[in-house]
Design a protein with these regions (language model features):
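Bacterial N-terminal signal peptides that target proteins for export
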Residues: 1-7
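Sequence/structural signature of beta-propeller domains
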Residues: 21-374
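Bacterial N-terminal signal peptides
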Residues: 7-15
């Protein structure tokens, strides 16, 4: 997500979250890179998603550059992360490759803004979401696009919509979260915030809505058809900026199975005049789809006459980063990592937004009771 918003104050019912974070997760610390820092000639910036390939013991990451002079190349990274019960021992970036289109050329400027990343079940390709251009693409492990899946998305998302259109995704609030289920049979992709026809985005006085889509995946790891669509309610903006610029939305999802996911809500607030100096509040929720309504046939939540019959997904607070660190940055990626002494690990990564005052940060949690075991 690029930070370029003005605050919107419209009314939706408040969603009050009273659940406490779970104690079975042990926070094992963070590992940071300064903006501008390089490693093995790799520029470390703009990381918006990360995924672990357990068979190869490597991680893939992606950045959200729009292929412009300021942000550099839209890129795919491979890296090694050494973890132990003591924390993150080392992060080694192995290489950085440009994301290329089907003709093996760099994407045209402002037709790419990669936000989500998932490894196909066969380990041969990568799926990634984008806020610009095609919402979902399949690429080789070297970053060359094999196919885009725009045709799978319903017309209500108005993929090519401009800022003046009255329906569809909002600029900068589009396709943030992406995950493939552990069995490789389906994927989830999440819109960051409310569609234009669904109501207002989150503000300090109202919740927001986000749509979570589920697609089936064929034997080759390619999405084939939409299965379901669910309503996720984001929290109101938790902290208000005196400059009146703030937001809250979904920044990533991670599937535990076909009906339970982790969802990151990332809220930013401006701490000085302008648009480039932000602090963040980040919460992670355990989400269950079991009792949720399927809204794939509802084009507009605002116009739907039977709102009282709609059941959003359930959510329970798992992690509030404010409980563990005073400097949570713009966290946009999460993956399961290597086992640590037989325990599941979670690794989060932040997007420095190519800004000098931010950092690229990796955060490690260890599931001491293996409650998140997949």
């Amino acid at each position: 997500m690029k930070i370029r918003y003005a605050a919107i104050f419209l009314a939706l019912p408040l969603l009050c979250t009273t659940a406490q974070a779970n104690s079975f997760l042990h926070y094992a610390g963070e590992f940071n890179f300064r903006t501008g820092e390089k490693q093995n000639n790799v520029t470390i910036a703009g990381l918006s998603a990360i995924i672990f390939d357990a068979k190869k013991n490597i991680f893939y990451a992606i950045n959200d550059s729009r292929n412009n002079n300021k942000e550099g190349d839209a890129s795919l990274y491979t890296l090694k992360i050494q973890v132990s019960s003591r924390g993150i021992e080392q992060v080694n970036f192995l290489n950085q490759r440009p994301l290329l289109d089907a003709k093996q050329q760099p994407f045209v400027t402002n037709t790419v803004d990669a936000e989500g990343l998932a490894l196909t079940h066969n380990g041969k390709s990568l799926l990634w979401s984008s806020e610009l251009g095609a919402p979902l693409r399949l690429s080789t492990l070297d970053g060359v696009m094999e196919k885009d899946f725009t045709s799978l998305f319903p017309a209500r998302f108005n993929i090519s919509s401009d800022k003046e259109s009255s329906n569809g995704i909002r600029s900068g609030n589009a396709w943030e979260g992406l995950t493939v289920t552990p069995d490789g049979k389906s994927l989830f992709i999440a819109v960051e915030s409310s569609l234009k026809q669904d109501g207002p985005i989150a503000s300090p006085i109202n919740s927001g809505t986000a749509r979570l889509l589920q697609f089936s995946i064929d034997a080759d790891g390619r999405p084939s058809k939409q299965l379901h669509e669910y309503l996720y309610i984001t929290d109101p903006v938790p902290q208000v900026s005196k400059f009146g610029i703030n937001d809250n939305g979904v920044s990533e999802v991670l599937a535990l199975n076909d009906h339970q996911l982790l969802v990151i809500e990332r809220s930013g607030r401006n701490v000085s005049a302008g648009f480039n100096d932000w602090d963040y509040s980040v919460r992670v929720y355990m989400v269950d789809l079991t009792a949720a309504s399927d809204i794939k046939n509802i084009d507009s939540l605002q116009d739907w006459s039977n709102k009282s019959t709609l059941q959003p997904v359930s959510k329970k607070l798992l992690i509030d980063f404010a409980d563990y660190t005073s400097s949570a940055d713009c966290i946009e990626g999460v993956t399961f990592g290597p086992l640590i002494d037989g325990h599941t690990s979670l690794i989060f990564v932040s997007d420095n937004n190519f800004q000098p005052h931010q950092q690229t940060k990796f955060y490690l949690f260890i599931d001491k009771e293996n409650k998140l075991k997949i």
